[in-house]
From Swiss-Prot:
Coiled coil found in the keyword field: yes
Keyword set includes ATP-binding: no
Protein name (Swiss-Prot/TrEMBL): Synaptonemal complex central element protein 1
Organism the protein comes from: Rattus norvegicus
Subcellular location, principal: nucleus
Length: 329
């Protein structure tokens, strides 16, 4: 009777180390299943009692199982090699993942910084745009103000020129009408009329003395003077002489009074003309100083506005500077 074979439980070296991957686990499960099937078959044959006739079959089956196990071990080794390779690739991929994640974090941080920088740039651009708009509005306001000041200065210059022409024409007319020669002629005429009146007064006085002498001659001796005076005073000659004397005296007084009044009027008119001339001269100087002060203040305002304005106010300032010589002339 043949000896009972022992259960085959031999495992190849390194099989425990190879059973770490999914393919090694599948190969181990397959070989173990085959061994268990063989052991069950041996036990069945032992129970039946027909183990010897089929020993060769068992040996062949064992050889097949060993070859299958060897093949499974080779496949398991290849699978382990593939597993190691895949594990290395997984490790490298994990490292690559960590590296890419680090790069992604850095890129995200850079992106966040760039977004903040872009927001700052946009806010700066908006601020500059608002400042530019304010500068444009300020420049347009200053240009309008400069135009208004130029128009105001032009109107002032025209008014000053018109007033100056009026004053000059008035002064010219006054000077032409009241020249010193003309005043001298009028004074000489008045003096001559005064001398003539004085001569007439002397003649009238001489006539009065002559009349008095005649009256004295007509009176005669002193004893009969009262009677003779009464007769002479009641005569027509005395009445005519007295009337003539009164008329001549009245006429001389009127002429003298008219001459004195005319002389006084001429002197008063001469003083008025001198005062008017002095007043016109002072007014002319005053208006000239005011216009010059206004021009200087306008120039200062234009200079200050030119310093804060754009090239457009610079052109307006140049135009104003070009107009100044014509206004001064």
């Amino acid at each position: 009777m043949a000896t009972r074979p022992q259960p085959l439980s031999v495992e190849p070296e390194g099989s425990a180390d190879l059973l770490h991957g999914p393919e090694g686990a599948r190969g181990r499960r397959g070989s173990t299943q085959k061994i268990e099937d063989l052991m069950e078959m041996v036990e069945k044959l032992q129970k039946v009692g027909s183990l010897e006739p089929r020993i060769e079959v068992l040996i062949n089956r064992i050889n097949e199982v060993q070859q299958a196990k060897k093949k499974a071990s080779e496949e398991l080794g290849e699978a382990q090699t593939v597993w190691d390779t895949l594990q290395k690739e997984v490790d490298s991929l994990h490292e690559e993942k960590v590296r890419l994640k680090d790069i992604l974090n850095r890129k995200e941080e850079t992106l966040r910084i760039m977004q903040l920088h872009c927001q700052e740039k946009e806010s700066e651009a908006e601020r500059k745009h608002s400042m530019l708009q304010e500068c444009k509005d300020r420049i347009s306001f200053l240009n309008n103000q400069i135009d208004n000041e130029k128009a105001k200065l032009r109107r002032l210059r025209l008014d000053f020129e018109e007033h100056l022409e009026t004053l000059m024409s008035q002064h010219k007319d006054t000077m032409e009408f009241h020249k010193p020669e003309h005043l001298t002629e009028e004074m000489s005429v008045l003096d001559s009329s005064k001398e003539q009146l004085l001569k007439e007064e002397k003649l009238i006085k001489a006539k009065l003395e002559d009349v008095q002498h005649r009256l004295c001659a007509l009176c005669g001796p002193e004893g009969s003077s009262t009677f003779s005076d009464g007769l002479f005073l009641r005569s027509h000659e005395a009445a005519a002489a007295m009337q003539m004397f009164k008329d001549e005296n009245k006429k001389a007084e009127e002429l003298l009074e008219a001459a004195a009044q005319q002389h006084q009027q001429l002197q008063q008119r001469c003083r008025q003309l001198q005062q008017k001339r002095q007043r016109l001269k002072e007014e002319l100087e005053k208006h000239g100083v005011q216009i010059l002060a206004q021009i200087q203040s306008t120039q200062k305002e234009e200079d200050s506005s030119w310093r804060t304005a754009s090239p457009k106010p610079l052109e307006a300032h140049k135009e104003t500077v070009q107009e100044r010589p014509s206004s001064r002339t």
